């Protein structure tokens, strides 16, 4: 009999309650200050990062091999036979490869590792769907086969108050930097086919960028039924405004407003508003 574990990283931006409810195993990114470090999700909250930005902008790093091994030891002791790992885009983080190197050395599990080529709650929504399939009793092979379909149905878009934090983290990629700030152009950011950040649209000023974000959501809803999560980093009021502007669409299934996690907050900075869209599967 298959006993399947789902493992992911903390960039999925799931809550502690969701992690418990879906029996997920999390590899936390590290949030590092000059004199201290924290495990994302478990040891630090986004508000802690934002309130300290004027003193110090932290960095993030990968979960350690020792921590990954401790998670695997626990799963082995609990009798898990199969492992499905669903991780942040390998173009944005070394987490996928770090996990792969450790898991490949273990003979206890039959495993499958999936590079989501996405980040944040869009990743989290893929993880939740996979965990639901585990609860439903689907087989290891069925879930693996479904992952590409779930990923194809899932997308995310973001707009930031400033690109400063994305630049500091070295993850700005194809996203236009200095010119955008100088001209008050706000890029709408997504990921390309390789899972790297890219600009898919620009708007002049904050108000127009939020309108553009809403119009992108409506375009997806026009194509079919979707679950939508509006994401924010210390911008809940604006996130609710975006949700209000799309809430009457007949193809909107479930909708919610969610806060991004601490590690995401390090790179997005305060004021990020985004969206996770998942087509009906």
UniProtKB/Swiss-Prot annotation:
Domain called DegV: residue spans: 4-279
Binding site for hexadecanoate: 60, 93
Molecular function, one GO term: lipid binding
Coiled-coil ranges per UniProt: none
SUPFAM superfamilies with a match to the protein in the record: DAK1/DegV-like
Keywords of the record: Lipid-binding
Stored PANTHER family: DEGV DOMAIN-CONTAINING PROTEIN DR_1986-RELATED (PTHR33434), DEGV DOMAIN-CONTAINING PROTEIN YITS (PTHR33434:SF3)
Its biological purpose: May bind long-chain fatty acids, such as palmitate, and may play a role in lipid transport or fatty acid metabolism.
Protein's name according to its UniProt entry: DegV domain-containing protein CPE2509
Record organism: Clostridium perfringens (strain 13 / Type A)
């Amino acid at each position: 009999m298959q006993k399947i574990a789902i493992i992911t990283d903390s960039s999925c931006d799931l809550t502690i309650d969701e992690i418990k409810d879906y029996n997920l195993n999390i590899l936390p990114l590290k949030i590092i200050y000059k004199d201290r470090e924290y495990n994302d999700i478990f040891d630090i909250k986004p508000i802690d990062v934002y309130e300290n930005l004027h003193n110090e902008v932290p960095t993030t790093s990968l979960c350690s091999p020792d921590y990954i091994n401790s998670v695997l030891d626990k799963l082995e002791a609990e009798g898990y036979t199969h492992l499905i790992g669903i991780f942040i885009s390998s173009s944005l983080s070394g987490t996928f490869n770090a996990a792969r190197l450790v898991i490949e050395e273990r003979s206890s599990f039959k495993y499958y590792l999936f590079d989501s080529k996405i980040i944040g709650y869009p990743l989290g929504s893929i993880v939740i769907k996979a965990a639901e399939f585990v609860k439903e009793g689907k087989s290891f092979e069925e879930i693996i086969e479904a992952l590409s379909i779930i990923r194809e149905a899932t997308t995310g878009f973001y707009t930031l108050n400033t690109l400063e934090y994305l630049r500091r983290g070295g993850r700005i990629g194809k996203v236009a930097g200095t010119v955008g700030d100088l001209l008050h152009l706000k890029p709408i950011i997504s990921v390309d086919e390789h899972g790297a950040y890219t600009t898919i649209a620009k708007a002049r000023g904050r108000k127009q960028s939020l309108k553009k974000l809403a119009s992108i959501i409506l375009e997806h809803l026009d194509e079919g039924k979707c679950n939508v999560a509006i994401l924010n980093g210390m911008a809940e009021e604006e996130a609710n405004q975006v949700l209000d502007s799309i809430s009457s669409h007949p193809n909107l299934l479930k909708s919610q407003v969610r806060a991004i996690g601490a590690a995401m907050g390090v790179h997005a900075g305060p004021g990020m508003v985004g969206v996770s869209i998942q087509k009906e599967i």
